[in-house]
């Protein structure tokens, strides 16, 4: 949405949330890259809070890719049984561990990550951002899917890949690595389903706020 009769300078408009949230760690309470990959896969269609709850006990049993690669599905399942779609995710985790074998073999490019079962573009973008890799895309989680259209940045769609594609078209590559999580944190804290607009650092440039006031 164009609020000002010309193409919006979104990089400038969004700079307050980039400043506010830049380099803030993802809410998944991982301690290393192996844990991050496992937790990102488990968190699909589930909550970060739930995955954080089950993770400590899981990683006591499976501290690395090597240990995970030699387990079997029936042994793994009870340890992730409270996770949504846990049976499918167990298959993914074991297959990935058998392919990768060791923690140091975990890939860190978009193509290599998305070649693994259970890792789509959103998950790959999270892994790459948290690993300080050059961005090849923009994180589009459920918060970004809700917030980006609301503020007028993109048109509305529930498809995360379409959201990411639109964001890539309107935002400079220099901010790809951080802007997805910045919008996500805004959505988690302020731009909730019932938004706290008066607290928002970018309400002056928000289509929703303009329409409501």
Question: In which residue ranges do the predicted regions lie?
Answer:
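Catalytic cores of DNA base-excision repair glycosylases
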Residues: 2-213
């Amino acid at each position: 949405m164009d609020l000002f009769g010309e193409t919006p300078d979104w990089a400038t408009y969004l700079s307050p949330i980039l400043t506010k949230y830049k380099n803030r760690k993802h809410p998944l309470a991982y301690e290393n890259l192996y844990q991050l990959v496992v937790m990102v896969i488990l968190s699909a269609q589930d909550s970060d809070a739930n995955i954080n709850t089950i993770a400590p006990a899981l990683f006591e049993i499976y501290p690395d890719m090597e240990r995970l690669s030699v387990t079997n599905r029936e042994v793994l399942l009870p340890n992730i049984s409270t996770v949504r779609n846990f049976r499918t995710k167990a298959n993914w985790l074991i297959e990935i561990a058998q392919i990768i074998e060791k923690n140091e073999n975990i890939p860190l490019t978009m193509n290599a990550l998305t070649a693994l079962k259970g890792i789509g573009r959103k998950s790959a973008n999270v892994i790459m951002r948290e690993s300080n890799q050059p961005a090849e895309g923009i994180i589009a989680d459920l918060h970004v899917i809700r917030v980006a259209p609301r503020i007028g940045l993109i048109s509305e769609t529930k498809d995360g890949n379409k959201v990411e594609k639109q964001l890539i078209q309107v935002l400079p590559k220099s901010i790809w690595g951080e802007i997805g999580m910045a919008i996500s944190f805004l959505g988690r804290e302020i731009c909730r389903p019932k938004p706290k607009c008066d607290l928002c650092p970018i309400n002056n440039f928000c289509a929703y706020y303009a329409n409501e006031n």
